[in-house]
Amino acid sequence: MNVGILGIGRYVPEKVVTNHDLEKIMDTSDEWIRTRTGIAERRIADDTIDTSYMAVEASKKALEDAGISGEDIDLILVATVTPDRAFPAVACVIQEAIGAKHAAAMDLSAACAGFMYGMITAQQFIQTGTYKNVLVVGSDKLSKIVDWNDRNTAVLFGDGAGAIVMGAVSEGKGVLSFELGADGSGGKHLYQDEYVMMNGREVFKFAVRQLGDSCLRVLDKAGLTKEDVDFLVPHQANIRIMESARERLNLPQEKMSMTIEKFGNTSASSIPIAMVEELQNGRIQDGDLIILVGFGGGLTWGAVALRWGK
């Protein structure tokens, strides 16, 4: 059975916070942020919008895009590091909101790589015949766990949610290969106590090495080469990290998603948010070979070779 994406949706808050806005509250500048990260602005949720609200809104759009109802969903998986509370899970909030009365529901935590973990967990459940339709959501309100006095982290993050419905697709479409990985010895480089703490140099070295390597490995598993790749959707963390992955695949700039300028790093939601952007712009077409790749705290990573279409 081939498993792929039947529908996709996203939600981003309306409030835009630019680099110039941040100049007013911390020792930074638009030039400093842009040259180091590629970010110009980010969306920030106000106090009335929480992780589950964003997740529900993205889920509704994904269901509409898939042409199914909540009752057709068998499992809900939510990747998040900023749940509204320890329990109930964000997935359970979604279950009630969309009327998915037949669905099991749980959250999972793999930081910014969480969406990749959720996507492959869903694919495995469907491929084994356990479930037919699985809703996978990445949703994070990182603005509530960053120290707004720390310019090294506060400038990076934005809020948002992205969702996909996964199910059976036609032969040759969907997930062709994948890789999930973790290196717990690097957990000390990116973690949260009260606020997000990051050793930027070590995370950068890890990400540059791992993103390119994992892209090449999933291509090899699928019996494909980098010449076969039509489009790259990396986790939107840092422009220099993303460029390193693109260069490893020998792709021109127009074949890589670059939404970080508008949305910043939205953690588990960054890949589906970027995919919606590229679909709307017509840069992802039916039959395209797409590489999705992400990394996050843990340290964790994941990559998927995906043939777009149903």
Swiss-Prot record:
Location in the cell: Cytoplasm
Enzyme type, top EC level: transferase
Molecular function terms, GO-annotated: 3-oxoacyl-[acyl-carrier-protein] synthase activity; beta-ketoacyl-acyl-carrier-protein synthase III activity
Primary location: cytoplasm
Active site as annotated: 112, 235, 265
Classification via Pfam families: ACP_syn_III, ACP_syn_III_C
GO cellular component: cytoplasm
Pathway: Lipid metabolism; fatty acid biosynthesis
Keywords: Acyltransferase, Cytoplasm, Fatty acid biosynthesis, Fatty acid metabolism, Lipid biosynthesis, Lipid metabolism, Multifunctional enzyme, Transferase
InterPro entries: ACP_syn_III_C, ACP_syn_III_N, FabH, Thiolase-like
Catalyzed reactions: malonyl-[ACP] + acetyl-CoA + H(+) = 3-oxobutanoyl-[ACP] + CO2 + CoA
Disulfide bonds: none
EC numbers on record: 2.3.1.180
Residue numbers spanned by region ACP-binding: 236-240
Biological-process GO terms, alphabetical: fatty acid biosynthetic process
CDD domains: KAS_III (cd00830)
Function as written in the Swiss-Prot or TrEMBL entry: Catalyzes the condensation reaction of fatty acid synthesis by the addition to an acyl acceptor of two carbons from malonyl-ACP. Catalyzes the first condensation reaction which initiates fatty acid synthesis and may therefore play a role in governing the total rate of fatty acid production. Possesses both acetoacetyl-ACP synthase and acetyl transacylase activities. Its substrate specificity determines the biosynthesis of branched-chain and/or straight-chain of fatty acids.
Protein family according to the UniProt entry: Belongs to the thiolase-like superfamily. FabH family.
Assembly and interaction partners: Homodimer.
Record's comment describing the protein's domains: The last Arg residue of the ACP-binding site is essential for the weak association between ACP/AcpP and FabH.
Protein name: Beta-ketoacyl-[acyl-carrier-protein] synthase III 1
Species the sequence originates in: Bacillus anthracis
Lineage, top ranks: Bacteria, Bacillati, Bacillota, Bacilli, Bacillales
